[in-house]
């Protein structure tokens, strides 16, 4: 029987979550969904001084917005301390762990001596018990750390799903501290116990964890447990080519929601930021989950490009059904103090403007102009509303006052005014657009007018 896929996302709640972080949630989520497995959320909150519930809430909010639903969790490491200590006791009893009484001053002196000798700084095994070895006298009043007895000789080898075969000599690994003097376990040990207890089959995470992997594999083996499959994702770079981080100006994921990006568009963009399916650039969430596997993860760092993200979002806006788009844009209209709009009218208006927009914020801006109109700039008025066109504007106002208020009837009224005045369409359309929408660039004039209130249109035209 094939083992069920179980993946996890294990963020530290020490600040907001940015796109580089959330991509490390997207891929394990997608792999679990693509294979009928489970996706687990684990909060690695052992850095008590920097962790906060507010940061946890932001992580969950960002995941919820993107639709990255989890099957189990959130589990909190700080709530599992008893379990970690129980496994530590098992390892002590099995001889895999030993107490080390070396002081910080002694470790610093050892490190300085090794660096002076051009050696790699590492713990030298002073307190590691070996057959026939006499250990130093235990100093009084010193609480030891617990170190993992790393295997000597041989190598740790794994086939990384992104980086390929990786081999690290055990001689490169010293005996890792897995519990502090106060008994609290350290990161690498907690991760192994969590992955073991949660039966994680695939660890998909950033490549900043590669150096932790051989140590974690050795702890897995000491516990007699099967080692999960590892896939270490390349770094996400910002637009300046630096590692994406809060320090380097990365935005919270939730800010993209506020800026009017669609969650499916963000999933599409993030998916392509390190994975590919041929030349396909635009795809739905459902297509992504049908196509996703670990074999097509990229090996090189991916660079964020906000212009490309806007383009992807624009494609999803265009493809979205008008009634769905009308529902999505309403919170953004509310932020502009526009509400109570007819659902059918709103869907029609979205259909008219969505091809011109990259975000829901932009779409809401256009829709507000339909409702409230705009004050044109003096420059646009002087350029487009000339003495030559004013009589035509007056004629159009008269025609619109009596015609049926439909796109076809409005188009016929405009055509008649053009015939009567000898003007070309741009000569009439430009000033009307400026007066009503505050810009000479809009969709077709008859479509715009049919969606605006007749009284407002006529009042604006009569002002000149």
UniProtKB/Swiss-Prot annotation:
Q: Which GO terms describe its molecular function?
A: ATP binding; glutamate-tRNA ligase activity; tRNA binding; zinc ion binding
This protein's GO cellular component annotations are: cytosol
What residue intervals hold the motif 'HIGH' region? Answer: 11-21
Q: Name the chain's protein.
A: Glutamate--tRNA ligase
Positions contributing to ATP binding: 246
- Tell me how this protein assembles: Monomer.
Cited NCBIfam families: gltX_bact
- State the species of origin: Polaromonas naphthalenivorans (strain CJ2)
Query: Example GO biological process term?
Result: glutamyl-tRNA aminoacylation
Q: Which PROSITE patterns match?
A: AA_TRNA_LIGASE_I
The UniProt keyword set, sorted, is: Aminoacyl-tRNA synthetase, ATP-binding, Cytoplasm, Ligase, Nucleotide-binding, Protein biosynthesis
Secretion signal: which residues? none
**Task of the protein:** Catalyzes the attachment of glutamate to tRNA(Glu) in a two-step reaction: glutamate is first activated by ATP to form Glu-AMP and then transferred to the acceptor end of tRNA(Glu).
Q: What is its EC number?
A: 6.1.1.17
Give residue numbers for sequence motif 'KMSKS' region.
243-247
Tell me which InterPro entries the record gives. Answer: aa-tRNA-synth_I_cd-bd (IPR045462), aa-tRNA-synth_I_codon-bd_sub2 (IPR020751), aa-tRNA-synth_I_CS (IPR001412), aa_tRNA-synth_I_cd-bd_sf (IPR008925), Glu-tRNA-ligase_bac/mito (IPR004527), Glu/Gln-tRNA-synth (IPR000924), Glu/Gln-tRNA-synth_Ib_cat-dom (IPR020058), GluQ/Sye (IPR049940)
Q: Keyword Cytoplasm, does the record have it?
A: yes
**UniProt subcellular location:** Cytoplasm
Query: From what superkingdom does this record's organism come?
Result: Bacteria
Which PANTHER family does the entry link to?
A: GLUTAMATE--TRNA LIGASE, GLUTAMATE--TRNA LIGASE, MITOCHONDRIAL-RELATED
The gene it comes from is gltX
| Annotated family | Belongs to the class-I aminoacyl-tRNA synthetase family. Glutamate--tRNA ligase type 1 subfamily.
The reactions it catalyses are: tRNA(Glu) + L-glutamate + ATP = L-glutamyl-tRNA(Glu) + AMP + diphosphate
